Structure formats: structure tokens, C-alpha cells
């Protein structure tokens, strides 16, 4: 099974420290957002509670893990959960102070929200039947687990230009939607693989191109790391609306991108080793005496369940059962009851799907009726997964800050409408019709790949706001040949259920897109009328609401939260402190705060996390003044700070200096490039007693006993003290230090001259190149 890397466990203490600082008022909410979002904690609508997105690599969970998630949701929140389109599970309505409790409790079950949000490598998905499907060429879930363990061990995986999504499909049927991921891997015959690159959904959705094919399994990891490195080096970190991998490829062109990728691949092959753990299988199933068949019953619902929810596994005598979880909404109570099935089916393993369902696997044929009875006692609406009734929806306006419309309740109303109009025969004919809904233009509900799909927006009608949806048609998954759904028009939200019902009834099992296009265009015209408020006020009220539709609750999205947020939070705090000081007759405490906020703002880019005001001041002097990035007129920064603290400077002088310093820091920030590099506009300041040697030198630095990533940060700081061409000899421990630190330094552009093992530690020779 998947193992949570030690780095993730070690980093929990850092999160705990920042949480305590936030709760005690030592850091503000914007700064803390840059900390919590990469830990998978998003602010919900209203800002008072959090959502915790737990990453579930490959979507596979043991009963004990699923039970732990249910317990965490019950004990640390209000028991409401949501299954996502990337096979994650979200715990909703989490008080801020309970976020650390979720992290700490679930780590013992190898579950974590780490990397569930922000500019990180997101949950790596794969076919939800990987390992039990008779059609798969390779059991790709094992690759997902190994790659996830590796990437979560890398510091750079948590500070990318933007989110980075990876998917694995076990065959060319492409159940994992590889074509709409940043990197998609498809298993071919004879243990070979094809890798796609540059796909994605959301703003300017795109289908990935073939980067390479017919490569071996071991090569896949090097290819992915090469793409990862290119994106990390050249992706635009400052423009939040244009910083996905597909935009980098668009800006520089495929040929230039491919050249960068090939150079990076050659560099990694020659200098790195990617350690992937292969001993990560799901437990081997005991052999059954015979294959066995599941019999029929007088219970008609059971017969429908067998027909539509179950199928054989490739393992003799075993079956799986997929439970349709309407719009992915489930409670902790339901999860915990579901886990009780393990008592009768000890081989049970759970899986989450891209259509927000739960699959029970490894069920012996003679125990299926018991499983059905248990499922029936828990859920009231569980038949027909992967059909027209299996509607995908994001959380939308129920909890999401960006949600315009209430997609969740629209989906529930569509399901209710279809259930009242469709019989079993029609549902069977429409099994390939996929309906996807988003509450806003973003693609959390994956509307670009739906057969029929919707994204929320608003329009003014008779001077009132009305919830509307864009309508899309024709999405189809097929690797690099994936077709994205095309926009066909807009309709008011209130008519969508009847519109869908009439549309699917005209299909009669035909998915001819030309025929469907004609019908959809005619129906859009039919349903496009919006009556006045006096005539029918329901048009002006969203599904699931009683009040009139409005934009109340909308706020800034947090998906890209990270370094930029932390910088801008400190700059804004500095600005507000200066304003407060002026309002209070130049209050000296506010002036001092503005000075500290200004000095701290950019230190995060240099990997400095000061624990005191003094460390902040000296950190800025060392990283920005002495290096020529900041105007040397501020070389007396520490002297001014000390004078402010000891009241040896007038309020007017302190305010004027701090105001100028704040403006200088803002200017430095404005000149920072998209890769967080700064322009050295002035000469370096070198003290007489600390002059650097003009000829190359070699220093020794013993970091034995220093854990990751502290050892890496210390080496970076030490290298900055050296001239270009100088050599640093470092002593590193075996294990994580020797595995991770050299690779990180190579990614920084440094040169590793030699790695030599000496008894139980390693000597590493590093040449400063940049």
C-alpha cells in the first residue's frame, strides 16, 4: 500500500507552529493562507470554516483508512464529506483549530491533505479499476503510489508556478482522462508506455500532445521529472491566470518546449537516480475453489444492482460493486457503516472514482447478496453508476468561494427529473451519456469532457440577477485524441432539469453528435425565455435556496495560494501599519511593525523563515542589501530599527525612513521575474572582515545529524557566501539527505562534482555555478 513519506510527517510540526501563530494573532489570515492551502485546507464560503482535501493516491483505500476518514470527519468537523473528480475525499466545515487534528490523526493511516491545494503536484489519479481490470496492460496503481511517494518527498513539489496534475491509464481506453492532465501516462502492450503532455481543463482547456511513446516503465519517471523540472524552471509564477504548463507551451511553442525537455531529460539521466518503491501491491487475494456466478433473486432491485453495479474482476471468483454516490456527497455515518462490510468480507478494498463514486472490490461471488443488503440499508439511491443518472458536480456555491451557481442542487433536481421520466430500458441505452456540471467557469466538475455539460454564470434580467448556465456538447475521452465539449448557448438555471429531460428522451440511445447538436439548438431556443419577477420569481432564485439570487459569498479563490500570497500579505500589512500610524499621530509601534513587515515580505523567496524581528532585519540585510538587490541607502536598516526600539529617533524620521523602505521593497518585488529571481541594481556590499577570496576555494561543511530540508537550506545559504566556481564539501547522512539534497541542488543549477560514501555518511563535492 501507499506510504506517507517521512518528509510529510516531519513537516507537520511546521504547520502546527504557523497555525498557533495565526490563532494567536501573530500572523494574519492572508499570510496563513499561503501556509494552509498547500496543506490542502481551503477557506469555505464565509471564511469561518475550512475544507480539508485528503489526497487518495490512485483512489485506493483500505477499510481502516476509510473508517479513519469517517472518524476524522465526525470528530473534527460535522461529518459532511465530498468525493472529488480527482479521487480525493474532502472533509467540510472544519474549524481552523481542528485542521492540525485532522493532519495528526490521519498520518497514522498514511493519509494526508499535503499537496491537496495550492501550487503543488496534486493527487495522481489512475483508472479506478487498476489492479482488477482484465483489460489493463499494466497495473498502473503501483506506479501512482511509487511516484506519489517520490514527489511528496521533494520540497519543490510544494512550490511550483501553479498546480501540476498527473494521470495514469492502464490501457488506451483511457479511464483516467490522461489527455486533459499536465502529464498523462497510458500503458501499451509489452510493458511499454506513452506519455502525453500539456493538457488541462479550466481557462483555455487543451488536449495534451504525445511527448514520447513505447518507453519502458522506469523511463516514465524520468520523463515526468523532466517535464516537472522544465515547468518549475520556466513557468510563470507571477501571472496567476496564465501559469499552467499548457500556457508555458503555448507561449514558447511545442518545439522550444520539447528541446528544453530533452536537455533536462539528458541531464537527469546523467546525474540523478529516481528511487521508486515497487513493493507496494495491494494484498494478494486468497484463491477461491471455483469461479462461481452470482445468481438472480426475487428481489428486483438486487437483480438491477447485479446488472448495473457489479462486474467480474480478473481475479477468479471475485467481483466488484460500484455504488453511485449522487454528486459525491456522503456522510461520516454512511462511511462508517460501509466499513462494517469488512467484517463479512475480509478481503475488501475501497476505491474512489472520477465520477465521484465508491467501488467495493475483492468481493467473493458468494458474498455479493450480503454486500447488496448492507448497501441498501445505507443508501437510498445507489443504482446505475456510470450512466446518464451519474451526474458529476463540483461543490459550487454551497461552500466554494468561486461558486456562482448552486450546481449541487441543480444536479439533484436533474436526477429527480430523469428518475421520474426514464425507465430501465432507456437508462441502459443512455449509459454512455455523461452529464457534468460546474458552478463557475472553472473545471472542477470537468465540464470540458462531458457529453452534455454546464458551467455557471449570471445574467441581468429586468435589472435583477438570474443564475444561468453555459451549455456544452460533445466531450469525449480518447487520450491525445480527446474531444473537448463545445459551447452551444446559455439557459437560465431554473429550466435546465426539464431541458435535459427532454433532450435525453429524444436520443433513444443515439449519440450522433450532429443529430444531438440540432436537437440541443432547438431546445435552447424553446427554453430560453425568462419571465419577469412578477410572473415567476423562481427564475430569480437558485436551486436549494429560498432567497433571491445574488453574488453574496463570492470571494477570492485560493487554488494558487503560496509564496505570492505571503509576499503580498506582508506588503499589505506594512501599508496598513503606515496608514494606522499616520491616523494615530505617527504611533511608533505601528511604524516599527511596517518596517518589519516590509523587511520580511521577500525573505520567503530566499528560503528564510525568521523567528524574531532581529532575524528579519539581518535576513533582509544579508539577502537583499549586501547582494546589491536593495538600494544601499538602507544599509543602516538595523541601526534605524534599534533606534526605533529604544526611542532614539523622532517619530517623523522613523516614519519617513520606513515609508521610503516600504516603497523600495515594493520596487524590488515589481522587478522580480516569473521565476522569483531579483535584479541586482547596485554593487554588492562586502565588509572588510568578510571579503571573499577572488580565487576558487574549497570549504568543508558537516551536516551529519541535520534532517531534510534544513540541510538543503543551510547548503543554499552557505553557497551564497561563496564565489562562482568555489567548491563546497558537504557531509550528509545516508537515507533521505543523500537521496534528496544533491537532486535539489542540481535543480537549482549547481554542479555535483563527486559523491563518495565514507562508512555511514557521504561526502558531496558541490561547485557553485549560479
Task: Tell what function each PLM region has.
Residues 763-770:
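Core SAM-dependent methyltransferase catalytic element
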Residues 562-579, 599-687:
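Long, charged low-complexity segments
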Residues 689-722:
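An N-terminal amphipathic alpha-helical segment
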Amino acid at each position: 500500500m501507499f506510504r506517507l513519506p517521512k518528509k510529510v510527517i516531519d513537516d507537520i510540526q511546521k504547520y502546527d507552529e504557523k497555525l498557533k501563530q495565526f490563532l494567536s494573532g501573530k500572523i494574519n489570515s492572508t499570510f496563513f493562507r499561503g501556509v494552509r492551502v498547500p496543506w490542502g485546507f481551503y477557506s469555505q464560503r464565509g471564511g469561518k470554516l475550512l475544507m480539508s482535501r485528503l489526497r487518495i493516491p490512485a483512489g485506493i483505500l483500505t477499510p481502516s483508512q476509510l473508517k479513519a476518514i469517517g472518524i476524522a470527519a465526525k470528530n473534527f468537523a460535522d461529518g459532511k464529506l465530498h468525493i472529488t473528480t480527482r479521487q480525493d475525499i474532502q472533509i467540510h466545515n472544519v474549524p481552523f483549530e481542528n485542521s492540525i487534528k485532522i493532519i495528526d490523526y490521519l498520518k497514522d493511516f498514511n493519509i494526508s491533505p499535503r499537496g491537496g491545494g495550492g501550487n503543488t503536484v496534486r493527487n495522481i489519479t489512475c483508472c479506478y479499476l487498476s489492479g482488477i481490470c482484465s483489460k489493463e496492460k499494466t497495473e498502473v496503481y503501483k506506479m501512482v503510489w511509487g511516484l506519489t511517494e517520490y514527489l511528496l518527498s521533494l520540497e519543490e513539489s510544494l512550490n511550483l508556478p501553479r498546480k501540476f496534475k498527473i494521470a495514469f491509464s492502464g490501457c488506451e481506453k483511457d479511464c483516467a482522462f490522461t489527455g486533459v492532465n499536465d502529464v498523462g501516462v497510458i500503458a501499451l502492450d509489452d510493458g511499454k508506455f506513452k506519455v502525453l503532455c500539456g493538457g488541462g481543463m479550466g481557462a483555455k482547456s487543451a488536449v495534451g500532445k504525445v511527448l514520447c511513446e513505447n518507453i519502458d516503465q522506469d523511463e516514465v519517471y524520468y520523463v515526468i521529472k523532466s517535464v516537472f523540472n522544465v515547468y518549475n524552471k520556466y513557468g510563470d509564477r507571477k501571472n496567476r491566470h496564465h501559469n499552467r504548463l499548457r500556457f508555458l507551451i503555448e507561449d514558447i511553442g511545442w518545439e522550444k518546449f520539447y528541446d528544453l525537455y530533452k536537455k533536462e531529460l539528458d541531464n537527469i539521466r546523467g546525474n540523478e537516480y529516481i528511487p521508486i518503491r515497487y513493493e507496494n501491491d495491494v494484498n494478494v487475494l486468497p484463491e477461491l475453489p471455483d469461479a462461481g456466478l452470482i445468481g438472480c433473486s426475487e428481489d428486483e432491485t438486487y437483480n438491477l444492482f447485479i446488472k448495473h453495479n457489479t462486474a467480474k474482476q480478473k481475479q477468479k471468483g471475485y467481483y466488484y460493486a460500484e455504488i453511485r454516490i449522487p454528486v459525491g456527497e456522503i456522510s461520516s455515518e454512511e462511511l462508517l457503516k460501509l466499513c462494517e462490510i469488512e467484517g463479512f468480507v475480509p478481503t475488501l478494498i475501497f476505491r474512489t472514482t472520477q465520477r465521484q463514486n465508491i467501488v467495493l472490490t475483492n468481493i467473493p461471488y458468494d458474498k455479493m447478496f450480503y454486500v447488496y443488503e448492507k448497501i441498501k440499508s445505507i443508501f437510498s439511491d445507489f443504482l446505475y453508476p456510470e450512466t446518464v443518472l451519474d451526474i458529476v458536480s463540483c461543490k459550487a456555491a454551497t461552500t466554494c468561494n468561486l461558486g456562482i451557481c448552486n450546481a449541487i442542487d441543480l444536479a439533484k433536481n436533474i436526477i429527480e427529473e430523469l428518475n421520474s421520466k426514464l425507465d430501465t430500458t432507456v437508462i441502459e441505452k443512455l449509459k454512455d451519456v455523461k452529464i457534468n456540471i460546474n458552478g463557475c467557469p472553472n473545471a472542477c466538475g470537468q465540464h470540458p469532457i462531458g457529453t452534455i455539460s454546464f458551467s455557471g454564470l449570471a445574467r441581468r434580467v429586468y435589472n435583477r440577477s438570474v443564475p444561468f448556465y453555459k451549455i456544452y456538447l460533445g466531450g469525449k475521452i480518447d487520450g491525445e485524441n480527446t474531444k473537448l465539449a463545445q459551447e452551444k448557448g446559455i439557459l437560465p438555471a431554473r429550466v435546465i432539469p426539464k431541458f435535459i429531460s427532454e433532450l435525453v428522451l429524444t436520443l433513444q440511445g443515439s449519440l450522433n453528435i450532429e443529430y444531438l447538436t440540432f436537437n440541443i439548438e432547438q431546445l435552447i431556443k424553446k427554453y430560453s425565455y425568462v419571465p419577469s419577477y412578477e410572473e415567476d420569481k423562481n427564475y430569480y432564485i437558485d436551486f436549494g435556496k429560498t432567497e433571491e439570487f445574488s453574488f453574496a459569498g463570492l470571494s477570492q479563490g485560493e487554488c494558487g495560494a503560496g509564496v505570492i500570497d505571503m509576499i503580498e500579505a506582508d506588503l499589505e500589512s506594512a501599508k496598513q501599519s503606515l496608514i494606522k500610524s499616520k491616523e494615530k499621530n505617527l504611533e511608533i509601534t505601528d511604524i516599527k511593525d511596517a518596517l518589519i513587515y516590509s523587511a520580511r515580505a521577500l525573505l520567503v523567496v530566499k528560503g528564510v523563515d525568521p523567528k524574531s524581528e532581529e532575524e528579519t532585519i539581518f535576513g533582509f540585510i544579508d539577502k537583499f542589501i549586501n547582494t546589491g538587490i536593495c538600494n544601499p541607502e538602507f544599509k543602516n536598516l538595523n541601526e534605524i530599527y534599534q533606534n526605533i526600539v529604544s526611542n532614539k529617533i523622532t517619530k517623523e524620521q522613523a516614519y519617513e525612513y520606513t515609508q521610503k523602505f516600504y516603497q523600495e521593497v515594493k520596487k524590488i518585488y515589481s522587478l522580480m521575474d516569473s521565476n522569483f529571481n531579483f535584479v541586482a541594481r547596485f554593487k554588492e556590499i562586502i565588509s572588510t572582515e568578510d571579503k571573499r577570496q577572488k580565487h576558487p576555494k574549497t570549504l568543508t561543511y558537516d551536516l551529519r545529524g541535520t534532517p531534510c530540508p534544513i540541510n538543503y537550506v543551510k547548503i543554499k545559504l552557505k553557497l551564497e557566501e561563496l564565489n562562482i566556481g568555489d567548491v563546497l564539501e558537504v557531509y550528509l547522512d545516508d537515507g533521505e539527505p543523500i537521496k534528496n539534497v544533491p537532486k535539489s541542488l542540481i535543480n537549482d543549477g549547481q554542479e555535483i562534482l563527486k559523491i563518495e560514501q565514507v562508512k555511514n555518511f557521504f561526502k558531496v563535492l558541490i561547485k557553485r555555478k549560479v
